[in-house]
Amino acid sequence: MVPSEIPQLSDAFKNEATAQNYIMGNVYGYIPTESSIAENPALLSTDELDIPWRNDKTNFKAYHINLGTLDTSSPYFNLWEGANGSKALYKGIREAYVFLENIDQVPDLDVAKKARWIAEAHFLIGYYHFCLLRQYGPIIVARNSVDMNAPEEQRYPRR
């Protein structure tokens, strides 16, 4: 039994405002911050750029790659698990699919706005897959959200 004051997934789609909060927070919230000099490995992990203003309080993850402190057990740009300040992009993909599966529940949603949000969710699914592919090479393409109570064969598909 779930207490009534605990929000449920259906609460996120009870009206236009809550659906907008869901897409902006739960779907857009996984976009990597590549515009930041500290968060973009293509900028500071090269020999062509150095940061003269660095100090012990500054955490430039990309610069640490240049220093040789990157290791396989705790990578700085961990888009797979979302560790070390990165965002877990497969979670973002799942949130986008959850949004697509539930957007029809929103009553009186403008048709044009609904179509735009659906297109935005599809774009972000593709963009998150692109970021994962660019980072790791061949990946598993998620084609829907998977119920976490589903059998293991459905939760972990083979390539």
Regions found by a protein language model. Name each.
Residues M1, S35-S36, L132-V141:
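Proline-centered turn/helix-capping motifs that create local helix->coil transitions or kinks
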Residues E5-Q8, R143-P151:
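Short linear capping/connector segments at secondary-structure termini
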Residues L44-L49, W117:
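Acidic helix-start/capping segments at beta-turn-to-alpha-helix junctions
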Residues F13, L70, V141:
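Short clusters of hydrophobic/aromatic residues that line enzyme substrate/ligand-binding pockets
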Residues E16, N21, G29-T33, N59-Y136, ...:
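Conserved, well-structured interaction surfaces
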Residues T33-P41, D50-N55, F60-A62:
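Short, solvent-exposed loop/turn elements at domain surfaces
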Residues E39-N40, L109, V141-N144:
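Short, hydrophobic secondary-structure boundary micro-motifs
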Residues M1-S45:
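Membrane-proximal, proline-rich intrinsically disordered regions
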